[in-house]
From Swiss-Prot:
Disulfide bonds: none
Region of interest: Disordered: 22-42
Gene Ontology terms describing biological process: double-strand break repair via homologous recombination
InterPro entries (UniProt xref): DUF5543
Name of this protein: Putative protein SEM1, isoform 2
Any single Gene Ontology cellular-component annotation: proteasome complex
Biased composition (Basic residues): 22-32
Cross-referenced Pfam families: DUF5543
């Protein structure tokens, strides 16, 4: 409560716990932390349910960034995981050697390829 630096508070919590300051800090902090936590838990759970499903649907429908592709890869089924693993290995491997795969990275052979996403690169490399 009276600490200004987080480092000092950590030192007091670790070293001073044996003396009895740790128990005093716990008693003082617990009610102050619990009451906002209980208040925040109710609405936070309801708010997090709907965006969670929305995020999963968005990630599965439009995987654009690396974070969304990882989330969609985790949320998908085991059969999809194998396809994702294959597509990721295909998209990361042909950076240097075969010219046919490098040619397909430009989306010239697949009309459905909009931008250079990992999700769209893998089918382009497979079809070519």
């Amino acid at each position: 409560m009276y600490c200004q630096d987080s480092n000092i508070c950590a030192v007091f919590a670790v070293q001073g716990g044996k003396v009895g300051r740790k128990h005093g800090i716990k008693r003082g902090r617990r009610p102050s932390i619990r009451s906002p936590a209980q208040r925040a838990r109710g609405p936070w759970i309801h708010e997090s349910k709907h965006p969670a499903f929305a995020k999963q649907q968005i990630n599965l429908e439009m995987p654009n960034s690396r974070a969304t592709t990882e989330l969609a890869w985790v949320c998908s089924s085991t059969s999809r995981k194998k396809k994702w693993a294959r597509s990721l290995t295909l998209s990361t491997a042909p950076l240097s050697p075969p010219p046919s795969l490098v040619h397909c990275e430009d989306c010239s052979c697949l009309p459905g390829c909009h931008s250079g996403d990992l999700y769209n690169l893998a089918p382009a490399e497979r079809t070519c």
